[in-house]
């Protein structure tokens, strides 16, 4: 398996044909997986906004005041309003905002970015990342696309790449019913391949001002396995989410 960044991409702006810009810069093959950072997808789709686009509601004022009290520094209620509008649920309101997006992703601040946004204050996640992945797939020679983001993980320090949208491949590879090396039947293992591809690509893409937003994964095969598009855990079976709903931050 080989991973390499797509070179020479300029700053992406609203309305840019991202698929064409990728396709003209690299000789893609049909079986390649193209991992595209959500930041450039959002920029091309016009998801850049100013804080003034989000007048603060009473709830946003209260949320920002609480966060400011905990952090010991002022928090902009307009940012809290943007998070509220981009979320279906605020799972935690302190000591930070843990949210569920409309498309099922759970993360901090609804994934809203304030870094590397030259045309505004805020960069929101794509509205429907899998549809974004499908549109990119239609415009490139490769037949598999993953839209990635970075986020933290419970029980571990640091961030890693995750998939928030995909097209042309299943989200997971199902090993259940197959045999291990000792001949025992596997009954549990479902491998989330799109998250693993996103995480591997993030090692190549990097972060900050030296980051490259599009990475090609070559010579990776899904194999002869059953696949599934189950990616975001259903609320009913998400016991951590249910527990966090009942948890209260004690400062």
UniProtKB/Swiss-Prot annotation:
Write the Enzyme Commission number(s) for this entry. Answer: 6.3.2.31, 6.3.2.34
Name-wise, this protein is: Coenzyme F420:L-glutamate ligase
Summarize where a divalent metal cation 1 binds, as residue positions.
113, 149
- Annotated residues that bind GTP are located at 9-12, 38-39, 43, 116, 205-212
Organism domain of life: Archaea
Q: Which gene is this protein's source?
A: cofE
Which parts of the sequence bind a divalent metal cation 2? Answer: 150, 207
* UniProt keyword terms in alphabetical order: GTP-binding, Ligase, Magnesium, Manganese, Metal-binding, Nucleotide-binding, Potassium
Give the GO terms filed under biological process for this record.
Answer: F420-0 metabolic process
Species whose genome carries this gene: Halorubrum lacusprofundi (strain ATCC 49239 / DSM 5036 / JCM 8891 / ACAM 34)
Provide any one GO MF term from the record.
Answer: coenzyme F420-0:L-glutamate ligase activity
Pathway listed for it is: Cofactor biosynthesis; coenzyme F420 biosynthesis
Role summary: Catalyzes the GTP-dependent successive addition of two or more gamma-linked L-glutamates to the L-lactyl phosphodiester of 7,8-didemethyl-8-hydroxy-5-deazariboflavin (F420-0) to form coenzyme F420-0-glutamyl-glutamate (F420-2) or polyglutamated F420 derivatives.
Cofactor names from the entry are:
Mg(2+); Mn(2+); K(+)
Q: What is the lineage of its organism?
A: Archaea, Methanobacteriati, Methanobacteriota, Stenosarchaea group, Halobacteria
> Which family is this sequence assigned to?
Belongs to the CofE family.
EC class, as a word, reads ligase
Relate the assembly described in the record.
Homodimer.
Q: Which reactions does this protein catalyse?
A: oxidized coenzyme F420-0 + GTP + L-glutamate = oxidized coenzyme F420-1 + GDP + phosphate + H(+); oxidized coenzyme F420-1 + GTP + L-glutamate = oxidized coenzyme F420-2 + GDP + phosphate + H(+)
Cofactor annotation remark:
Binds 2 divalent metal cations per subunit. The ions could be magnesium and/or manganese.
């Amino acid at each position: 398996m080989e991973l390499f960044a797509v070179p020479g991409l300029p700053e992406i702006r609203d309305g840019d044909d991202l698929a064409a810009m990728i396709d003209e810069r690299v000789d893609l093959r049909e079986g390649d997986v193209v991992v595209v950072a959500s930041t450039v997808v959002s920029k091309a789709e016009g998801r850049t906004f100013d804080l003034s686009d989000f007048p603060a509601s009473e709830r946003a004022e209260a949320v920002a005041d609480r966060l400011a009290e905990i952090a010991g520094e002022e928090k902009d209620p307009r940012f809290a309003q943007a998070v509220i509008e981009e979320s279906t649920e605020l799972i935690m309101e302190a000591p930070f905002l843990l949210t569920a997006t409309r498309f099922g992703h759970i993360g901090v601040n609804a994934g809203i970015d304030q870094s590397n946004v030259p045309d505004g204050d805020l960069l929101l996640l794509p509205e429907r990342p899998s549809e974004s992945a499908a549109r990119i797939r239609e415009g490139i020679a490769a037949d598999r696309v993953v839209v990635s983001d970075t986020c933290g993980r419970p029980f571990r320090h640091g961030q890693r790449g995750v998939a928030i949208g995909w097209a042309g491949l299943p989200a997971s590879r199902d090993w259940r019913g197959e045999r291990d090396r000792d001949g025992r039947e596997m009954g549990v293992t479902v491998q989330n391949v799109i998250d693993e591809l996103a995480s591997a690509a993030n090692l190549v893409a990097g972060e900050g001002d030296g980051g490259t937003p599009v990475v090609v994964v070559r010579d990776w095969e899904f194999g002869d396995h059953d696949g599934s598009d189950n990616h975001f855990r259903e609320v009913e079976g998400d016991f951590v989410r249910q527990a966090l709903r009942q948890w209260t931050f004690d400062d």
